[in-house]
Amino acid sequence: MSVKKASFPELFDLVVVGAGHAGCEAAMASARLGLKTLLLTINADRIGHLSCNPAIGGLAKGHMVKEIDALGGMMGLWADEAGIQFRLLNTSKGPAVHSTRAQIDRDAYMKAVQRDVFRQDNLWVWQDTAENVLVENGRAAGVSTLLGQEFRSRAVCVTAGTFMSGLIHVGLTHFSGGRLGDPAAQGLSASLRAVGLELGRLKTGTTPRLLRDSINFDVMVEQPGDNPPRPFSFRSRHARMPQVPCYLTWTNEATHEAIRAGFDRSPMFTGIISGTGARYCPSIEDKIARFPDKDRHQIFIEPEGLHSPEVYPGGIPTSLPLDVQKAMIATIPGLEKAQIVRPGYAIEYDYANPTQLKPTLETKVLPGLWMAGQVNGTSGYEEAAAQGLWAALNIFCGLRGLPAFIPGRDEAYMAVLVDDLVTKGTLEPYRMFTSRAEHRLLLRENNADSRLTPAGRSLGLVDDAQWQLYTAKKTALEQLLAELDARQVRPDAATRDIFVHMNEAVPTRSVSLADLLRRPALGITDLQAFGLETDGFAADVLEEAQTIVKYSGYLKRQEELVLRTARHESVVISEAADYAAVHGLTREAVEKLSKVRPRTLGQAARISGITPAALSCIEVYLKKNGWL
């Protein structure tokens, strides 16, 4: 039911704390599903802000944007509206790992997010700082704020990003902040500890921003986008904004010398920073220290927007002193006269190790309290948005008495993300890669809709327009696959000439178009020579049909593997299980199982140190207690 926004309700269904990518995705989904939702933010002017690089997508990340979209989420639509360059990455490899990445106009993206957030029925916004999670009768019951407000709710979702006790470092100068220009949330960490959560400390960083007009692009390598650009959303026909290039330059030995000269004033090397940094997004000073033999590092000059005076030099995040940053920049080809508009900096912040969460992202220690996004130890906009949507769907299911939304690792990258987090935890910022998904052949960007849109529809987040697009594509794909299987090509004189012209062996018997498509050198459009009409099919339908046919053998083996492992995934472990009472388990196994409290035997198997023998012991215990 839609509720127009008048005065604030006395009782919200959900309070979302933080309006970054996790918070906006969670709040929009919750409100669209009919839950009365409050989005609480430290700065309403920065709702949906891209705090680091002006880009969305990338390897495995593009898959998650597509999955968010397939479920009815928003990130793909917002990215398509603000995208100023789109590229499909990994095209030299198989289609399973092709990933979309878009440069984003930072202001246009934020405006799109804020427009939808402020217009959305059932969704209220309040600028303030969350100080405490309210608890009543052993459940989260709302939040209180720095301004003394209390917002009562049936559920709370903390999506605080880097804001919990955030500490910013530029050289040996450090000060409180959630990001440069915004205050930190100082009280929330203590409140979360008070309800029983254990918090750790992580670190991330960003690059200095440069004045566009002070850069010499002529000595750099231009990096154009794809033409035509391919949007993220299954609901988008095309990109909306003019497309612009990026540029590539490199560091050199003079750059590295300038950086080394500042090591003695680096907060990372002097021990001032205690938080663990991102392994896969290291600072430039870390790269120089760890790889002294490498004579240069790439720097991608990324536009901040069509009309922005700033650019983002991707590849040189740093927390070195400002004078060192200036000296470093001045040695880079094309940046000799570049002016720094904003310094690069590192930020430390509190996070909750996600083994303290259920697979729904609800905390184990306090019912009604959910956590999503960077506060769970992840890095990246896309990982955050995926968690925000996941949490919102499960909050909706919980409040409505529906089964939890927990797809398997063979169904979604976001499922791999959440399962890794709640099962293994993380002591460093977690980033998604295609290599983390053991069933990645089944998890292609192009089939995200067939994997997840029916689930989004059944939950109520996929609207009629999106459902019609999905069913039309599904019908067209089924029609095309049927035609490829049914239509036969005979080795007669006419077809023989076609095969010879294509440099292909002539078959000795009649073969289907699908059989021909399995030949490595032939693509689906080549089959037009044999009478296949492709003009009536959209490009994504043709591409998906080609993938399904060409990789049918591999896909079948992958599906068989999923079936073989499905038995463990279907064995649910009772919440009442006492691992100390399981005969045959080692002390290590008891400790890890008691901490994670896996939902299924399959999840238990993915905990480090849990052997097949331990799984057998658990299964015997479950049967003995009548839980199997």
From Swiss-Prot:
Subcellular location: Cytoplasm
Keyword Cytoplasm (UniProt): yes
Cystine bridges: none
GO biological process, one term: tRNA methylation
Record's keyword annotation contains ATP-binding: no
One Pfam assignment: GIDA_C_1st
Annotated Gene Ontology cellular component terms: cytosol
Gene3D superfamilies, alphabetized: FAD/NAD(P)-binding domain, GidA associated domain, C-terminal subdomain, tRNA uridine 5-carboxymethylaminomethyl modification enzyme MnmG/GidA
Binding site residues for NAD(+): 277-291
GO molecular function: flavin adenine dinucleotide binding
N-terminal signal peptide: none
InterPro entries membership: FAD/NAD-bd_sf (IPR036188), GIDA_C_N (IPR049312), MnmG (IPR004416), MnmG-rel (IPR002218), MnmG-rel_CS (IPR020595), MnmG_C (IPR026904), MnmG_C_subdom (IPR047001), MnmG_C_subdom_sf (IPR044920)
Binding site for FAD: 18-23
Main location: cytoplasm
Cofactor(s) needed: FAD
Key words of the record: Cytoplasm, FAD, Flavoprotein, NAD, tRNA processing
Family: Belongs to the MnmG family.
Subunit structure: Homodimer. Heterotetramer of two MnmE and two MnmG subunits.
Database matches in PANTHER family: GLUCOSE INHIBITED DIVISION PROTEIN A, PROTEIN MTO1 HOMOLOG, MITOCHONDRIAL
Protein role: NAD-binding protein involved in the addition of a carboxymethylaminomethyl (cmnm) group at the wobble position (U34) of certain tRNAs, forming tRNA-cmnm(5)s(2)U34.
Name of the protein in question: tRNA uridine 5-carboxymethylaminomethyl modification enzyme MnmG
Organism: Oleidesulfovibrio alaskensis (strain ATCC BAA-1058 / DSM 17464 / G20) (Desulfovibrio alaskensis)
